[in-house]
Amino acid sequence: MSRTGLVAPKYTEDFVCIGSACEDNCCGSWGVPITRSAYEKYQTLPDGSLRTLIDASILLAPKGAVDSDGFGPEGFAKIRMNESNACPIKSAEGLCQIHSQVGPSYLSSICATYPRVFRSVRGAEQNALALSCPEAARIVLLNPMAWKQVEPPAPTSGETYSEDLPNSSVLWAIRSVVLNIVSNRAYPLWQRLLHLGVLCQQLDALPPDWPEVEASKCLDDFDRTVADGTLSFDMDSVSVDPSAQLDAVLRLAGLMGKKSIITPRFVECIDAFKTGIGYGPTATTLASLTAGYKTAHDRFFAPFFNRHPHILENYLINTILRCRFPFGPDDKNRDAVHSATREFTTLIAHFSVMRGLLIGVAGAHRGGFSTAHVVQTVQSASKCFDHHPEFPTLAHDLLVKLGLDRLNGAALLIRNQKSGSRALGKRRSSNVCLIPEMQFSAEHA
């Protein structure tokens, strides 16, 4: 038996590429893999300038090439970027010459579908958009009614699925609970995220494959404990630790700064972030910058997002669908230590670094902080983090190393209050500021 259905944010239906009007370009600054089927199709093109250009622009993968080298999961070929790190098949107007001359059917799969992201869990499609596209980031983040969930129809016989996952009815129930948690504004967003963490712990305590009876009881018990305030994790015990937050943001951003291609748009955001937290010749230590980070949050970030609560909610929902949270990678990419709690830690890493960068950018622009700054920050940071195949593992391992995995660590990373919080405990005495690691050299895209 299989169940077909769709979890579809409204924005996946609304997206339309704006072409040469776009302030960025998806034809550069990263690897563009070419599948074997696309390559073979290119070989059928008649001789001419386009065929010559395509042949000169494709680099076949050497033996042992991996996804992180830009050749994609298939490991067959990729576009050989030019000296400006842009696709040489792009026209002077910024448009794809393959698309314009022979049509979209000749595009490699990544070029044909980007920024749409398709994820399948037991036959249920989960559609999202890659926020590395500026127009996608706009329609995902800025629409107050951005998503809707379409329940699957009755089960039908047909396909079978070999994924090491529970049956489809359990998956749909878990997906529904997860999305309802994120969108429930009866609780502040940091508490909603911790609710997700508690749920992940409870799912991991179930027998393997999350049997339907046990999983249904787990979800019912979870809903009840949230409703009556008897959740196993004491939200009131969470300390506010802006120093731990800033330290983690700097380390996470610096981690990818060493591995990813940094675009000029992202450099602008990093420069604004540094300005917003008060980085300068006489302020370079973590201790000296924490006060600026806290001020940026309390005076500019928090008031803005209190007026626009849907922005971070939409970011989380899109990330949940894009990353198949809490189910994790598909079978091909699933590792032996997969767990819902591990997926939660990775989700917190995504959210923490994005939120931390936005806090600094808000501090730089102060009262002028706007949705345009949000879109640029999220889009350019997503281009750096979300498309790097090593980020989930590196980010998870970093938070484990810092002791910020699981619920207590997540709580320290995501809770900020201007007043009424518990006294800050002395978790660490680090005097090292990692901002110099973030002084990237921009690639010219």
Provide a role label for each language-model segment.
Residues 1-11, 52-96, 104-109, 113:
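Short, charged low-complexity linear segments at domain edges
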Residues 30, 99-103, 121, 162-166, ...:
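Conserved aromatic-histidine-acidic binding/catalytic patches
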Residues 135-224:
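Charged, amphipathic alpha-helical linkers/stalks
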Residues 48-84, 120-169:
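Short Fe-S-cluster ligation motifs
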Residues 14-32, 82-117, 130-137:
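Local cysteine-cluster metal-coordination motifs and their immediate loop/turn environment
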